[in-house]
Amino acid sequence: MVLYNINEFRTGLKIIQNREPCVIISHESIKPGKGQAFSRVRFRQIISGKILEKTFKSGDFLESANIMEIRLVYVYHDNEFWYFMDEKNFEEIAVAAKIIGTNIKWITTQLHYIVTLWNKVPILVTPPDSIELKIIKITPIKKNSTGSSGIKLATVSTGAIVKVPFFIQLGELIKINTRSGIYISRAK
């Protein structure tokens, strides 16, 4: 177990706060004219995603979090778990659907994902920034829609629903931003 003094705080440092792994987003060291120096720290809880702010006095220590981020390829899933494989040693890691959360709509076979482990237990699955998926269904367009914005709803192969321009057809591959769920372009 490694302990960090407030002088060692830096952006991206992974710590334990309230028995939950966190990553420091920003920190500000303040040395007042009178009194003890302190550090104001903003951090994000990795599991819940909440952003918190806390002030630490000089002399305070925080425990480091045993966090590993590994790049794995998604292979398959059963009723309970989604399985990711390390391509170097062919080890599989089972991840429960509740851990994947809303990112489940961006999970597709043979694509690489970042799996975050805390004490060798998966706590987060992060998809790539953008992925290419095939359109399997498009909502019908009404001919009398005069105030249309030039978009229609398309369902992709993973089941996610994405707004796409009118010129996109059924069966096309499109590129989607997984952070926002927005159509980027046709796949090349």
From Swiss-Prot:
Pathway: Protein biosynthesis; polypeptide chain elongation. It is found in: Cytoplasm. Keywords: Cytoplasm, Elongation factor, Hydroxylation, Protein biosynthesis. Its main location: cytoplasm. One of its GO terms (cellular component) is cytosol. GO terms for biological process: peptide biosynthetic process. May be beta-lysylated on the epsilon-amino group of Lys-34 by the combined action of EpmA and EpmB, and then hydroxylated on the C5 position of the same residue by EpmC (if this protein is present). Lysylation is critical for the stimulatory effect of EF-P on peptide-bond formation. The lysylation moiety may extend toward the peptidyltransferase center and stabilize the terminal 3-CCA end of the tRNA. Hydroxylation of the C5 position on Lys-34 may allow additional potential stabilizing hydrogen-bond interactions with the P-tRNA. SUPFAM superfamilies: Nucleic acid-binding proteins, Translation proteins SH3-like domain. The modification N6-(3,6-diaminohexanoyl)-5-hydroxylysine is found at residue 34. One of its GO terms (molecular function) is translation elongation factor activity. Pfam families: EFP (PF01132), EFP_N (PF08207), Elong-fact-P_C (PF09285). It comes from the Bacteria. InterPro entries: Elong-fact-P_C, NA-bd_OB-fold, Rib_uL2_dom2, Transl_elong_fac_P/YeiP, Transl_elong_KOW-like, Transl_elong_P/YeiP_cen, Transl_elong_P/YeiP_CS, Transl_elongation_fac_P. Involved in peptide bond synthesis. Alleviates ribosome stalling that occurs when 3 or more consecutive Pro residues or the sequence PPG is present in a protein, possibly by augmenting the peptidyl transferase activity of the ribosome. Modification of Lys-34 is required for alleviation. Belongs to the elongation factor P family. HAMAP family: EF_P. This is Elongation factor P.
